[in-house]
Design a protein with these regions (language model features):
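Non-catalytic terminal and boundary segments that flank Rossmann-like NAD(P)-dependent oxidoreductase
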Residues: 2, 6-65, 281-290
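N-terminal Rossmann NAD(P)H-binding glycine-rich loop of SDR-like oxidoreductase domains
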Residues: 58-86
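SDR active-site strand-loop-helix element
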Residues: 69, 93, 132-133, 169-175, ...
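NAD(P)H-binding glycine-rich loop region in Rossmannoid oxidoreductase-like domains
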Residues: 98-156, 160-163, 178
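Core catalytic loop region at the nicotinamide-binding pocket of NAD(P)H-dependent oxidoreductases
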Residues: 243, 247-249, 253-285
Length: 290
């Protein structure tokens, strides 16, 4: 990759991330304003680092047609440029009238993620469906929102994909079971959506992270020493690994690996598998092209 290409990509990423955090309708203090822009720069640096990492990996021999719901959020906005870089065709669902800024190379279609009737007809010819819709900044106080947004959008996506016979459905869930009852509503909704996937007999990859470290989401780094101790102790090791922290880069690579290795039946990708995606992706591509 040339220096000019890196600079161009960095500039586009900065523009995209500044666009994400600028919201005139929400009053902020100067401190909030500065913090948002610091997060935007950090996100752009993270985007460039991930893009350079992906460029060093071998590409899949088969290009996928990918339909994404929730593509303008924290995970989706990092995933889409990587899928495009790996020569996949990406179609993103956005709300009618949305001013969300997306890479020019992806196709944008209008619809409501809470009503599959508004977008079912534009899913094809996609062969892979990634569902990333979720209430931003989950907290115990948002139980009603989880059922109104996460549950309804998941049900609609699963139903539409089952009716269309989608080749591969990828669902971003959450690690469970978990001993923390404070997020029980969030976990319950994701578990119910997983059950729907099973009942509709979709060929699906279910990805179960716990907390995703990245720009604006770094405070849990303080918990790393605690996690290390729990992973070392035999009676807490399994839970610590299941509910471990993953980085945004690890999660994006796990999603890419899922896209490029469709499954028959159901595959669950937990925290240990998410962490190892950077190693497994080149092996999977080598296996496919052998």
């Amino acid at each position: 990759m040339s220096f000019r290409t890196v600079c161009t990509t960095l500039g586009a990423s900065l523009e995209l991330n500044f666009f994400r955090v600028c919201n005139p309708a929400r009053p902020t203090t100067i401190q909030d304003w500065l913090q948002e822009r610091i997060n935007a720069v950090a996100a752009s640096i993270s985007d460039i680092r991930l893009l350079l990492r992906v460029k060093s990996l071998p590409k899949s021999s088969e290009s996928r047609r990918v339909f994404i719901t929730g593509g303008t959020g924290y995970i989706g906005s990092a995933l889409i440029p990587i899928l495009l870089e790996r020569d996949h065709r990406v179609r993103v669902l956005v709300r009618p009238g949305s001013k969300a800024k997306l890479p020019a190379a992806c196709e944008v279609v209008s619809g409501d993620a809470l009503d599959a009737n508004t977008y079912r007809q534009v899913i094809r010819p996609s062969d892979t469906f990634i569902h990333l819709v979720g209430v931003p900044h989950p907290s115990p106080a948002k139980g009603a929102q989880f059922r109104a947004v996460d549950m309804v959008s998941g049900r609609e996506a699963i139903s539409a994909c089952a009716e269309l016979g989608m080749r591969h459905f990828i669902y971003l869930s959450v690690a469970h079971p978990a001993p923390l009852r404070i997020m029980k509503d969030y976990i319950a909704v994701r578990a119910e959506c997983e059950q729907m996937i099973q009942e509709r007999h979709l060929n699906a990859t279910i990805i179960r992270p716990w907390y995703v470290l990245g720009p604006g989401h770094r405070w849990p780094y303080l918990l790393l020493p605690f996690y290390k101790v729990c992973e070392w102790l035999p009676f807490t090791r399994a839970g610590a690994l299941r509910l471990g922290l993953v980085t945004l880069e690890q999660l994006i690579l796990a999603l890419v690996q899922a896209v490029e290795s469709p499954i028959q039946g159901t595959r669950v990708v937990g925290v240990p598998e998410i962490r190892s995606a950077a190693l497994n992706l080149p092996r999977e591509i080598t296996r496919q092209t052998a």
